């Protein structure tokens, strides 16, 4: 049914302040968003903090989805780190003497190309209800927090420092006053931080610290150097001695520390030493591995060379009750002979493991955090209970189809590609079983074929393209890039070796970006464009491809230095996660002019072609103020105007966290910055133009979602009921007019019916009140399936029932000065809707029922029968 809007204003008094003074984030808070999950694949857990006196209460720290708390052993979780300045967590610690005191170190401790950064240390005195930032804001990544066993004011923080560049605020820090002040106890240099710190459980003056020299660049990773080492202090950190007796000579990579709780004379470490990493290298071929000391680190013996992918999560854990039982992370494995041999059991959980906790009172009780959430075991990690209610999925890309209800397609970090409904017709909402897996690996963009809605183009890492028929289950690999024009292998082995050109090693896979770009042409439904280092075009749905040229600088990354030297085969964790460079990162076409193409790369080139890729013009220099070698992240050609396009660029991979967003009106010949008043340091990820209002822009950043109603002159954060989040992608549904948001840490969020945002303007904001257009509504007879599911059961939110009615109040008014009435086509009063009288944007729901004249008021009010389908009018009246 359709509902029109009508506004009646009585006794108006208008003032005309500037737009910039009026619009605020608070003004938009009346537009609620809903989180639909998913939780079926969960997401990356980086640390655990368990209350030992009550192990049913524990906290889970996520890579980019904040902190979650359970008080019932995982049956249910609540988010407790929602509105801070960051979403990324590296470490968490709970004070065992006073479990109300929590410490959180922000910024992932992994070194991924997708790792997010934080802004220091936070502390809570009320079990996570409120938080205070207590310093070390420029440390960016926190590896571990060690707390004094009796003095709640004493803590040690392992600050890793910037991942993408040098900085000073790194090393081991110490506070004796609860975080009011900090002293740096251990510092090597601007390239080296501290990744781990451990305190002797019997003597808090004895500390072990692992220093870690590492640097990631757009073109590679160097995970070690002379700064890495193992240190010990016996005077609470005042002085330090490097521990080397029995350890190998040479440079180290990452080191993890575990002290045997029942006998602190015994210490285990995992030690990385240089070895070229590629995905086909067996883990046990690496140098170094697991070491043990029986005399508090004075001497060491090599137990085994087992150390799975150390740059990511190299961390041993010795069972607090059994010296012979050692667990290792990244690839979950255990040893029953003090680390001489390891068993890596076939898991029913995710295989990329980050953290493990063993109950000191019962070693059978184990909790594991990995890239797929949390598992709990009661038999020492053999059988697992998977926690199914944590919606912390990390989306890279999102797309929608035109089904009813429409479906949402997306790719996730280390959890493949999935599709699920935007709503269901059941009271339970959107459930885990509503989501269907489309592909494996790391998932990225998934697009529905415009000719056949049962065909989906799915993508995994490094442009791993395939064409999937949802009805038959048939999948055809269509990755471009084979030098002879055939379909390139879709596997992601690193293709570099000494003296062997990258494209010729192994399976001859062409270079492709981690998040390889592709799109289906707006002008021809059978045409696809996709980028490796070359831009490729297919006119037969990906069955064959033609090259439109290598659009990178073609630089040889082996000639590029990291931390002042060129990497070599012995470099620790060489190029982990970046097997190819340079590559294309963004491609798009003008929606009005066939053959007008835009292409951007990870080595900083922005090029345009007006002849479908036959010739290219490098227009990078036209983007004023843009540093060299920036990452071209997203193009957004205008749906309204030919020649207009937007680009979102970021440069954090060069340790630059400024905002770079631009607009062209002439097919890329000239560009104008539209950074406007966007708060500093947000880092642009994606930008979209509204399909109905050319002045309305949506900007997804590493820290927050922003809108502009004047094409980028001014920006305001749209947060409402969402936590602090990274927004990697977004789309506006062309039929339902919903804003669909892909977050890298909390799944998918939806703002239903963005009519109010589309109709906002400086003129509207100057009015005393405004009633916005109302989308069609329908009566849904929801199914109540009454299943006995228990409470460990995630339920994504359905849209609120009824007609969504949005209105704006410039100033607050008295409660009796505002009314909202519903009339039928004959002008008869149907219902009166409860309103809110405070200033700002508001959304209220009409439940599509007649008013019950005998129902009473307040909480006892009962609704009348449903209205008949037809046309209705909403009338907002404001007196003032």
Locate predicted features.
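Bacterial N-terminal signal peptides that target proteins for export
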Residues: 1-7, 677
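Beta-propeller blade termini and top-face loops
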Residues: 21-793, 800-803
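Contiguous beta-strand segments within globular domains
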Residues: 784-817, 823, 843-845
């Amino acid at each position: 049914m359709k509902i029109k809007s009508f506004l009646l204003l009585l006794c108006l008094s208008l003032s005309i302040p500037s737009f910039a003074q009026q619009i605020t984030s608070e003004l938009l808070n009346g537009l609620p968003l809903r989180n639909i999950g998913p939780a079926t694949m969960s997401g990356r857990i980086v640390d655990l903090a368990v209350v030992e006196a009550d192990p049913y209460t524990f906290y889970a720290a996520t890579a980019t989805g904040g902190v979650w708390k359970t008080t019932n052993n995982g049956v249910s979780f609540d988010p407790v780190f929602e509105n801070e300045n960051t979403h990324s967590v590296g470490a968490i610690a709970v004070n065992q003497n006073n479990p109300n005191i929590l410490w959180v170190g922000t910024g992932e401790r992994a070194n991924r190309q997708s790792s997010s950064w934080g802004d220091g240390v936070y502390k809570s005195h009320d079990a996570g209800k409120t938080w205070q930032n207590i310093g070390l804001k420029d440390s960016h990544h926190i590896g571990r927090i060690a707390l004094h066993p009796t003095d709640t004011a004493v803590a040690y923080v392992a600050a890793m420092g910037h991942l993408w560049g040098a900085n000073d605020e790194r090393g081991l820090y110490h506070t004796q006053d609860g975080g009011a002040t900090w002293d740096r106890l251990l510092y090597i240099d601007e390239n080296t931080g501290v990744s781990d710190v451990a305190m002797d459980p019997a003597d808090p003056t004895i500390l072990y610290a692992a220093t870690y020299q590492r640097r990631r660049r757009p073109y590679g990773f160097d995970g070690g150097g002379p700064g890495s080492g193992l240190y010990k202090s016996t005077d609470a950190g005042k002085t330090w001695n490097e521990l080397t007796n029995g350890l190998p000579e040479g440079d180290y990579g990452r080191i993890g520390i575990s002290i045997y709780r029942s006998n602190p004379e015994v210490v285990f470490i995992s030690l990385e030493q240089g070895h070229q990493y590629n995905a086909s290298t067996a883990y046990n071929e690496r140098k170094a591995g697991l070491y043990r000391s029986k005399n508090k680190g004075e001497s060491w013996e090599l137990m085994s060379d087992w150390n799975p992918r150390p740059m990511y999560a190299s961390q041993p854990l010795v069972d607090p009750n059994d010296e012979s039982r050692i667990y290792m992370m990244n690839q979950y494995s255990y040893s029953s002979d003090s680390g001489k041999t390891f068993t890596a059991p076939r898991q029913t959980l995710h295989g990329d493991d980050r953290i493990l906790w063993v109950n000191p009172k019962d070693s059978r009780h184990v909790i594991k955090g990995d890239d797929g959430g949390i598992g709990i075991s009661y038999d020492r990690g053999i059988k697992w209970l998977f926690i199914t209610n944590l919606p912390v999925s990390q989306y890279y890309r999102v797309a929608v189809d035109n089904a009813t209800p429409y479906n949402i397609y997306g790719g996730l970090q280390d959890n493949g590609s999935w599709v699920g409904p935007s709503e269901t017709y059941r009271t339970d909402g959107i459930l885990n079983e509503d989501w269907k897996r489309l592909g494996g690996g790391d998932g990225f963009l998934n697009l529905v074929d415009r000719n056949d809605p049962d065909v989906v183009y799915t993508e995994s890492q490094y442009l791993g393209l395939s064409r999937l028929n949802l009805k038959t289950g048939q999948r055809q690999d269509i990755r471009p890039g084979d030098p002879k024009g055939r379909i390139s292998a879709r596997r992601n082995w690193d293709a570099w070796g000494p003296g062997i050109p990258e494209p010729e090693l192994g399976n001859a896979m062409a270079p492709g970006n981690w998040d390889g770009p592709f799109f289906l042409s707006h002008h021809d439904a059978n045409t696809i464009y996709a980028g490796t280092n070359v831009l490729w075009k297919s006119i037969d749905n990906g069955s064959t491809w033609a090259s439109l040229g290598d659009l990178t600088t073609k630089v040889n990354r082996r000639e590029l230095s990291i931390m002042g030297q060129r990497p070599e085969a012995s470099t620790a964790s060489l190029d982990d996660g970046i097997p190819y460079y340079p590559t294309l990162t963004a491609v798009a076409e003008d929606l009005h002019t066939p053959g007008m193409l835009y292409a951007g790369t990870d080595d900083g080139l922005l090029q345009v072609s007006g002849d479908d890729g036959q010739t290219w013009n490098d227009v990078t220099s036209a983007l004023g103020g843009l540093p060299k070698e920036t990452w071209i992240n997203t193009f957004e050609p205008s749906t309204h105007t030919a020649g207009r396009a937007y680009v979102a660029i970021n440069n954090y991979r060069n340790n630059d966290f400024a905002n770079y967003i631009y607009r062209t009106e002439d097919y890329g010949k000239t560009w104008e910055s539209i950074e406007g008043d966007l708060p500093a340091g947000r880092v642009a990820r994606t930008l979209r133009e509204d399909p109905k209002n050319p002045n309305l822009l949506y900007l997804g950043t590493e820290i927050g979602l922003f809108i502009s109603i004047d094409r980028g002159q001014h920006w305001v954060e749209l947060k409402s009921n969402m936590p602090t989040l990274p927004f990697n992608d977004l789309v506006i549904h062309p039929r339902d007019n919903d804003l669909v948001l892909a977050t890298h840490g909390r799944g998918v969020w939806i703002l239903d019916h963005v009519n109010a945002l589309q109709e906002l303007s400086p003129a509207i904001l100057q009015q005393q009140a405004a009633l916005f257009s109302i989308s069609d509504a329908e009566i849904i007879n929801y199914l109540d399936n009454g299943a006995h599911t228990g409470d460990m059961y995630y339920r994504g939110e359905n849209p609120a029932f009824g007609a969504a009615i949005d209105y704006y109040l410039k100033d607050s008014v008295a409660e009796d000065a505002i009314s909202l009435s519903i009339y039928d086509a004959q002008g008869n009063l149907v219902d009166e809707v409860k309103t809110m009288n405070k200033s700002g944007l508001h959304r209220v729901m009409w439940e599509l029922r007649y008013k019950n004249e005998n129902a009473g008021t307040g909480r006892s009010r009962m609704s009348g029968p449903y209205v008949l389908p037809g046309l209705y009018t909403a009338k907002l009246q404001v007196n003032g």
